[in-house]
A protein has these predicted regions:
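Charge-dense, helix-prone N-terminal extensions
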Residues: 1-141
Length: 141
């Protein structure tokens, strides 16, 4: 199945209002990254076992692991989880960056080393979320 089709199906599989909000965030990210590589990870390992939430990815960077190996990965991830929605901002070396920069201003959200999780778009300052995404778009690798 084509990635764009998988993404549409992933969004459509969500109950309302999560579905509409996930679509709104997908549109927002694509507007910010119009020609980016798109990804879809179904959350299953090689044995078909569900190990993570299905994730839509945008953009790319080279991820370097502790053993020195590298892998291409998405810069921005969007997913639905039991708590609501999450935007993952990948490849940030400083694990406190998101917390320190956006934790106090984004609104009612849990901000971690690479993720911003919130129940609803209405609970957060969307301009601050856009700023966090834009910061990662502009950062090399």
């Amino acid at each position: 199945m084509e990635i764009k089709t998988q993404i549409k199906e992933c969004i459509k599989s969500q109950p309302e209002p999560k579905q509409s909000e996930m679509q709104e965030l997908d549109n927002l990210i694509l507007k910010m990254m119009p020609n980016c590589k798109q990804w879809y990870f179904d959350g299953k390992n090689e044995d078909g076992k569900q190990v993570a939430h299905p994730t839509i990815g945008y953009g790319n960077y080279i991820r370097t692991y502790k053993d020195g190996s590298t892998r291409e990965f998405f810069r921005i991830g969007l997913l639905a989880n039991p708590a609501g929605l999450a935007v993952h901002i990948m490849g940030i070396d400083d694990k406190k960056f998101l917390i320190d920069r956006y934790g106090k201003t984004i609104g009612k959200a849990k901000v971690g080393s690479y993720g911003i999780t919130f129940k609803s778009i209405k609970d957060i300052n969307l301009e601050i979320l856009k700023e966090a995404i834009q910061n990662r778009i502009e950062t090399r690798n």
